[in-house]
């Protein structure tokens, strides 16, 4: 009943208006799973390959018809007839079929679309929600959201070097309340920015992209918004940063052009330490560049006991990169992006490896998203306790928050909100 009888991919558009891959997988009993693949703006050099056509006459070279053809041709030919409940075997077949270390032949966007659609079809056939099918009976922890309310870097057209400024409603009693708290701060921040004569247009992930002068300027606005919304910074709501520092690491220096700073790796660590001393920062993502292992080690030795240090470009959801980081004592948290590695199986392997090393995991969206809310289910399935899925604007972001609210309702009295259990030190 769970044999795959049809696999069909199409080219659709993501939240930035760029093409992406969507896949439908149909099973023998008539059930169907559908998955759409996200894409990033700031991408790590070690990520699996997102296959683009390169035809400048079509979507400015960003079309994905080759990836679609790979799904409808080679992948479908090899997977039709396979049992959709055998996720590990199916993912392994696609990895072997591709035959490259970074999924560059068929494309990680082709392989991931099939991998996730297979899981969703199998869950439907088993009459289970996706979080339960993937996570089993123990899947019940609702994650604390990292809500990106001010954008900089590659996600906005302003002089702020750091890419994301986020709030984390750790004192909420449940996900529904966490979303409410975040929404109230978001709308209060909009009023504060408007009153200061600053723009309130939003960036790729729904956060505001005002023309602020510095990192501290952005943090001060957020603190004021938290307080005016009736909450206590550092108690009710914590702060988080995504530096995306690989984007401004040039010639061995951290070139923060917006602030006119040129910092050595040691000076960059001191800069971040000073921010953590002055603001209630719970988490810093990509505080050092993806191949600055010495900088990462210094950052971890300096702040790792009290701050969550998340590797995104550093680890790219890749078990091999993560193992190297664990061995070197770099970072203490894994950012989980399914399209960085390209299959559900490898994603879950990375989360398990992080857990064994006592690293936390943060389930994450990409800046180019769709209405697909799979990562909400995966956050609960893995009990990872944290999710990063943008601001309280744009339906591509809210789809994930709304799905978490639904999952909490389904879990009923067994649901647990991670809350302050994620705090370090």
Swiss-Prot record:
Catalytic residues (positions): 205, 337
Cofactor annotation: Mg(2+)
EC number: 4.2.1.11
UniProt keywords, alphabetically: Cytoplasm, Glycolysis, Lyase, Magnesium, Metal-binding, Secreted
Pfam families listed in its UniProt record: Enolase_C, Enolase_N
Coiled coil ranges: none
Recorded GO MF terms: magnesium ion binding; phosphopyruvate hydratase activity
InterPro entries: Enolase, Enolase-like_C_sf, Enolase-like_N, Enolase_C, Enolase_CS, Enolase_N
GO BP annotation list: glycolytic process
Entry keyword Secreted: yes
Cofactor notes: Binds a second Mg(2+) ion via substrate during catalysis.
Broad enzyme group: lyase
SUPFAM superfamilies, sorted: Enolase C-terminal domain-like, Enolase N-terminal domain-like
Recorded GO CC terms: cell surface; extracellular region; phosphopyruvate hydratase complex
Catalysis: reaction(s): (2R)-2-phosphoglycerate = phosphoenolpyruvate + H2O
This protein's record includes keyword Lipid metabolism: no
Cellular localisation: Cytoplasm; Secreted; Cell surface
Binding site for (2R)-2-phosphoglycerate: 163, 337, 366-367, 388
Pathway(s) per entry: Carbohydrate degradation; glycolysis; pyruvate from D-glyceraldehyde 3-phosphate: step 4/5
Transmembrane segments: none
Residue numbers binding Mg(2+): 242, 285, 312
Function description: Catalyzes the reversible conversion of 2-phosphoglycerate (2-PG) into phosphoenolpyruvate (PEP). It is essential for the degradation of carbohydrates via glycolysis.
Record HAMAP family: Enolase
Family per similarity comment: Belongs to the enolase family.
Protein known as: Enolase
Gene name linked to the record: eno
């Amino acid at each position: 009943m769970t044999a795959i009888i049809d696999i069909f991919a199409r080219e659709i558009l993501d939240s930035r208006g760029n093409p992406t891959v969507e896949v439908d997988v149909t099973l023998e009993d008539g059930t169907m799973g559908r998955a759409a693949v996200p894409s990033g703006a700031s991408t790590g050099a070690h990520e699996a390959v997102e296959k683009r056509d390169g035809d400048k006459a079509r979507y400015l070279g960003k079309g994905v018809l080759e990836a679609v053809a790979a799904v409808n041709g080679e992948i479908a030919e090899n997977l039709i007839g396979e049992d959709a409940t055998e996720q590990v075997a199916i993912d392994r077949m696609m990895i072997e079929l591709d035959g490259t270390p970074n999924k560059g032949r068929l494309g990680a966007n082709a392989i991931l679309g099939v991998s996730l659609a297979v899981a969703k079809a199998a869950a439907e056939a088993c009459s289970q929600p996706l979080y339960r099918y993937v996570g089993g009976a123990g899947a019940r922890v609702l994650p604390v959201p990292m809500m990106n309310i001010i954008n900089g870097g590659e996600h906005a057209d302003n002089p702020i070097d750091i890419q994301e400024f986020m709030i984390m409603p750790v004192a909420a009693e449940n996900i529904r309340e966490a979303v409410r708290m975040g929404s109230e701060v978001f709308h209060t921040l909009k009023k504060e920015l408007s009153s200061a004569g600053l723009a309130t247009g939003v960036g790729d992930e729904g956060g505001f992209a005002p023309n602020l002068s510095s990192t501290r300027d952005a943090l001060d606005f957020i603190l004021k918004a938290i307080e005016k919304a009736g909450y206590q910074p550092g108690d009710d709501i914590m702060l988080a940063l995504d530096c995306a520092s690989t984007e401004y690491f040039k010639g061995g220096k951290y070139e923060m052009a917006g602030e006119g700073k040129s910092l050595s790796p040691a000076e960059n660590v001191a800069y971040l330490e000073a921010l953590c001393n002055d603001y209630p920062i719970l988490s810093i993502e990509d505080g050092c560049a993806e191949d600055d292992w010495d900088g990462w080690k210094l950052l971890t030795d300096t702040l790792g006991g009290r701050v969550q240090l998340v590797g995104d470009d550093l680890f790219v959801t890749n078990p091999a990169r993560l193992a190297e980081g664990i061995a070197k004592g770099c970072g203490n948290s894994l950012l989980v992006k399914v399209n960085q590695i390209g299959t559900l199986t490898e994603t879950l392997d990375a989360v398990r490896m992080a857990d064994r090393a006592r690293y936390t995991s943060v389930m994450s969206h990409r800046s180019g998203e769709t209405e697909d809310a799979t990562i909400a289910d995966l956050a609960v399935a893995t009990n990872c306790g944290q999710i990063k899925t943008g601001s309280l604007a744009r339906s591509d972001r809210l789809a994930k928050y709304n799905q978490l609210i639904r999952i909490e309702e389904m879990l009923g009295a067994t649901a647990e909100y991670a809350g302050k259990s994620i705090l370090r030190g």
